[in-house]
Amino acid sequence: MTQSSIGRIWFCQIQRLLALIVLIGLSQGLSQPAFARGGAAQVDAELVFAVDISYSMDQAEQVLQRNGYAEALVSEQFLQALKGGLYGKIAITYLQWASYRDQDVILPWTLIDGPESAAAAAAKLRRAPYRRAQRTSVSGAIDSAMYLFENNGYDGLRRIIDVSGDGPNNDGRPVEAARDAAVAAGVTINGLPLVGIRPYLGYADIAELDLYYQDCVIGGDGAFMIAIHDRKAFVDATRTKLVQEIAAPRIRPQPSDILPAQALSPKTNCMIGELMWNRRWRN
């Protein structure tokens, strides 16, 4: 046997060995349990409830928001949608926000996998104390929510930020910049703007907050908003939103599949809140 023949035999054997290694690796990868990102538990969605507590939100509106989320979590419609998910569970956290420096979490990341865990989370929300704070930074809320996703112990098919509030951004960086950064990372931002709940407009309020949320706040794969015009509608709107989010397609969107901003050019001045604030205080 010549030296060249021996070389060809060794080359073929090495090829077979490499192919076997690849097949073993693929089979092991396919048989891994439902954990990812360093052991994070897989869920259908990771949701941040980002709720406005600025002074434009009076006590009644704050109670309305909080109870809306609590009641939606224990509703039959939500629990049925939860069971229909690929994993039958989601992870939630509740973030309160005002200025870009003022955010706090009153419900840390919590696994919701059925009626008992949903009821326990709802009870914690209802027990948490209320507070109010200065300014309205929607961008700060989005940025803080993005931080909360990191190393939270969960790996959701979707990551969603639910922004609820009654006014435009007037503090922190421009809201479009925060939204676009979140969308570019594959996160969906949905909205629950409170529009015309009070019979008057304050100096930091705008009449068409729903259009502002549509053009400047929400974004990402399947993003939507539900404008709330009546206090009595908050529970129904929150429940509808949660059901729609859980029932959404269960494949995590890739950043390359998502437009970094709204598909159409904004019709609303997304700096309106900052302009109104500066005009009010002449700075």
Predicted segments, located by residue:
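Von Willebrand factor
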Residues: A41-P108, S117-S164, G191-L201, E208, ...
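Bacterial N-terminal signal peptides that target proteins for export
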Residues: T2-A19
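Von Willebrand factor A/integrin I-like adhesion domains
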Residues: L194-R252
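VWA/integrin I-like adhesion module and closely mimicked acidic/polar interface patches used
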Residues: L82, G167-D215
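Bacterial N-terminal signal peptides
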Residues: R16-G29
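DG-centered beta-turn motif at the end of beta-strands
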Residues: D52-I53, A145, L157-D171, A178, ...
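Short beta-strand-loop
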Residues: G85-K124, L201-D215
